[in-house]
C-alpha cells in the first residue's frame, strides 16, 4: 500500500497488536467506529495468500484481509457513492497491471518491512493514482505519490530470519496480473469490501 516513511499506519496492518478480547463488551462498537475507507489495488491468488502467510509471522491477520500494492488510504471524509463512481470510471480507462515483487525493503529508521514491485508495475500504479485523483478522488496530502508497496509489518529482531526465509520465494515473485481494485472498510480485526471493479481499459 502507499504509505510514506514516518506516517502512522493502521495498527491492524502494521503492528502485532491483537484485536479486543471477547470480554470487551464495547469492542464491536469501537471496531465499527475505527474502520476507515481504503482503495485497494488487489493482489490475486496465490500471491495474496503467500503475502498473508508472511504477515502472520508478525501479526494477527484475518482471512478476509486484502493484499494490495499501491493502495491508498485511509481516505479523508467524502461521499462513498462518489468514490464508487470514480472507481467505475477509472477502471474503464485502465488496463490490467502486470508485474512482480522485485525486492523486500525496510522503511528508513523503522522496523516496518514491505515488498516492492518492479519498476514497470510501480509506474503503472502511480499512473493509476493520478487517474483516480483526476477523476475526483480526494486523498490526504501525505499519501499522494508515495512509493507503491505491499506491507509486511513491523518485524522484531527475533523473527527477522523467519520473515526473510518465508518471503524469499516472493523476491522475485512469479509475474502476476492485478485485474481489480476495490473500496474496502478496514479496522482492527475488521475488513469488508463495499465495491469492486475490474480493469477493462487498454492502456
Per-range role (PLM):
Residues 102-110, 146-148, 182-190:
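Short proline/glycine- and acidic-rich turn/helix-capping motifs at secondary-structure junctions
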Amino acid at each position: 500500500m502507499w504509505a510514506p516513511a514516518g506516517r502512522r499506519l493502521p495498527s491492524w496492518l502494521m503492528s502485532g497488536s491483537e484485536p479486543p478480547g471477547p470480554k470487551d463488551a464495547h469492542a464491536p462498537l469501537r471496531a465499527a467506529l475505527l474502520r476507515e475507507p481504503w482503495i485497494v489495488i488487489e493482489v490475486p491468488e496465490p500471491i495474496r495468500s503467500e503475502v498473508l502467510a508472511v504477515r502472520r509471522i508478525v501479526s494477527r491477520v484475518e482471512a478476509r484481509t486484502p493484499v494490495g500494492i499501491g493502495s491508498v488510504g485511509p481516505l479523508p471524509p467524502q461521499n462513498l457513492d462518489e468514490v464508487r463512481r470514480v472507481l467505475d470510471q477509472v477502471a474503464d480507462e485502465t488496463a490490467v497491471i502486470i508485474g512482480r515483487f522485485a525486492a523486500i525493503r525496510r522503511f528508513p529508521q523503522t522496523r516496518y518491512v514491505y515488498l516492492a514491485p518492479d519498476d514497470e508495475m510501480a509506474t503503472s500504479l502511480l499512473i493509476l493514482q493520478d487517474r483516480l485523483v483526476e477523476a475526483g478522488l480526494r486523498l490526504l496530502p501525505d499519501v499522494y505519490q508515495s512509493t507503491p508497496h505491499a506491507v509486511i509489518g513491523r518485524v522484531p529482531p527475533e523473527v527477522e530470519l523467519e520473515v526473510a526465509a518465508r518471503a524469499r520465494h516472493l523476491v522475485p515473485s512469479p509475474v502476476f496480473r492485478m485485474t481489480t481494485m476495490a473500496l474496502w472498510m478496514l479496522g482492527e480485526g475488521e475488513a469488508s469490501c463495499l465495491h469492486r471493479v475490474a480493469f477493462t481499459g487498454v492502456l
